[in-house]
């Protein structure tokens, strides 16, 4: 019996998980998404071609991989169908859990309207309706992908939901669709998606029993976890390794190696605490060189220096076996590079994450920069200062680096 390896982001998302999964996919039979929705975005470059994935597992770019969208994901049929249109021959290579919850048009309308009502206190959601979808799930009023197999019954259930919440929709100035319009959409979803809907948990159990190689692909980052992130400026699902298991119906004994994906610096989209944010020239330089624009939202990411306190925290949360250090090349040409080794908090120096992270100040150490690592594939060819930087990050995080990315391209990766 084999075990499922897990890839998790250990900052605030956008760490480069897509490239790592894409690089590793050739060694796996199954690649699985466990949580989130189309608020997540993976960017993968192959032979100069850019692929932006939101719901599809990154294994879709490898013909031999079977791709699974698990029960913990909230699925927008509209977005998924559009994404599927980019690829050929998906039958037999893509499966969607019948237990995954649906993310429909009214969810995004609710999301956008509620953010507007919050004004300056807005969380900074993607507006994709992910929170409202998970809220329906927790309230036990949601609908699941398996219900698409009976579109007429699902339409009737949704219309009853809309009628029961009519006052709420009117308050938010959201127009309720007609039954005819809704049924037409559901029938279209049914026609296209039915061949892909199945019990993916049983499929994965069978795969592990048969010693197939399985990779679980996390979405977003551990600092956005609903329980352990910078609440309330978090996502609506579990983004840590334990959540990857529950989002696919696997138990803790079925976890294999856990790899944490981390940028050589730090970024964040949306509002919330970000201790190492640099609002000056260095932050702007990182943003421009790193092309730090959100894949799902098109929003500019906030940029700053590597936060070793946060990474040490998320490394423990996830039980990491190794790190994959991404976008090291973005720091090419910086004369000095900062690392946050601790925080100042209420007059004390601390090395942990308090629940009120917005009240800390970073304590930095500086290291000398380097000229160029771009495109290097051999560790021995890295500049000495880059090697020293990597070694210091390992020391502060308490986890060894196994992979180093030196460009957006799939093959520009050092494996240690």
Curated annotation (Swiss-Prot):
Q: Which UniProt keywords apply?
A: Cytoplasm, GTP-binding, Ligase, Magnesium, Metal-binding, Nucleotide-binding, Purine biosynthesis
Q: Which cofactor does it need?
A: Mg(2+)
One GO cellular component term noted in the UniProt record for this chain: cytoplasm
The note on the cofactor says: Binds 1 Mg(2+) ion per subunit.
User: Could you tell me which pathway this protein works in?
Assistant: Purine metabolism; AMP biosynthesis via de novo pathway; AMP from IMP: step 1/2
Reactions catalysed, as given in the entry = IMP + L-aspartate + GTP = N(6)-(1,2-dicarboxyethyl)-AMP + GDP + phosphate + 2 H(+)
Q: Which GO terms describe its molecular function?
A: adenylosuccinate synthase activity; GTP binding; magnesium ion binding
Q: Where does GTP bind?
A: 13-19, 41-43, 301, 327-329, 405-407
- This entry's Enzyme Commission designation comes to 6.3.4.4
Keyword Cell inner membrane attributed: no
Which compartment or compartments is the protein found in? Cytoplasm
Q: Give the highest taxon in the source lineage.
A: Bacteria
Q: Which residues form a coiled coil?
A: none
Which residues bind IMP per the record? 14-17, 39-42, 126, 140, 220, 235, 299
Q: Where is the active site?
A: 14, 42
Q: Where does substrate bind?
A: 295-301
- HAMAP family referenced in this protein's UniProt entry, alphabetically: Adenylosucc_synth
Q: How does it assemble?
A: Homodimer.
User: What family is this?
Assistant: Belongs to the adenylosuccinate synthetase family.
NCBIfam families assigned to the protein according to its UniProt record, in alphabetical order: PRK01117.1 (NF002223), purA (TIGR00184)
PANTHER family given in the database record = ADENYLOSUCCINATE SYNTHETASE
What this chain does, per the entry, is described as: Plays an important role in the de novo pathway of purine nucleotide biosynthesis. Catalyzes the first committed step in the biosynthesis of AMP from IMP.
Q: What is this protein called?
A: Adenylosuccinate synthetase
Organism of origin: Campylobacter jejuni subsp. jejuni serotype O:6 (strain 81116 / NCTC 11828)
Q: What is the lineage of its organism?
A: Bacteria, Pseudomonadati, Campylobacterota, Epsilonproteobacteria, Campylobacterales
């Amino acid at each position: 019996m084999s075990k499922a390896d897990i890839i998790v982001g250990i900052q605030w998302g956008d760490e480069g998980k897509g490239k790592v999964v894409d690089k590793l996919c050739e060694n796996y039979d199954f690649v699985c998404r466990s949580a989130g929705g189309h608020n997540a975005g993976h960017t993968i470059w192959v032979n100069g071609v850019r692929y932006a994935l939101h719901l599809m597992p990154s294994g879709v770019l490898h013909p031999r991989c079977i791709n699974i969208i698990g029960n913990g994901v909230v699925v927008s049929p509209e977005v998924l169908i559009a994404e599927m249109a980019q690829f050929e021959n998906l039958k037999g290579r893509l499966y969607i859990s019948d237990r995954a919850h649906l993310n429909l048009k009214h969810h995004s309308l609710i999301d956008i309207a509620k953010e507007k009502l919050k004004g300056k206190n807005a969380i900074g959601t993607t507006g994709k309706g992910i929170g409202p979808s998970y809220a329906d799930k927790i309230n036990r009023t949601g609908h699941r992908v398996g219900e698409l197999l009976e579109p007429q019954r699902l339409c009737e259930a949704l219309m009853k939901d809309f009628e029961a919440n009519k006052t709420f929709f009117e308050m938010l100035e959201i127009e309720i669709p007609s039954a005819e319009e809704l049924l037409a959409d559901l029938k279209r979803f049914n026609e296209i998606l039915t061949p892909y809907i199945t019990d993916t948990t049983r499929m994965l159990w069978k795969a592990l029993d048969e010693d197939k190689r399985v990779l679980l692909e996390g979405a977003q980052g551990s600092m956005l976890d609903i329980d352990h992130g910078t609440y309330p400026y978090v996502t609506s699902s579990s983004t840590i390794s334990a959540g990857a298991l529950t989002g696919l119906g696997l138990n803790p004994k079925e976890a294999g190696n856990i790899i944490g994906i981390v940028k050589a610096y730090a970024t964040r989209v949306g509002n919330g605490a970000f201790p190492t944010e640099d609002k000056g020239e260095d932050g702007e330089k990182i943003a421009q060189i790193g092309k730090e624009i959100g894949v799902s939202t098109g929003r500019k990411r906030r940029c700053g220096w590597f936060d070793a306190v946060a990474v040490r925290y998320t490394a423990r949360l996830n039980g990491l076996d190794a790190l994959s250090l991404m976008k090291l090349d973005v720091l090419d040409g910086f004369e000095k590079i900062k690392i946050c080794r601790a925080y100042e908090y209420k007059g004390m120096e601390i090395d942990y994450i308090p629940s009120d992270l917005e009240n800390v100040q970073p304590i930095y150490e500086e290291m000398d920069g380097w000229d160029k690592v771009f495109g290097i594939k051999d560790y021995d060819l890295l500049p000495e200062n880059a090697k020293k930087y990597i070694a210091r990050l390992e020391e502060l995080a308490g986890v060894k680096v196994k992979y180093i990315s030196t460009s957006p391209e799939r093959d520009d990766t050092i494996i240690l």
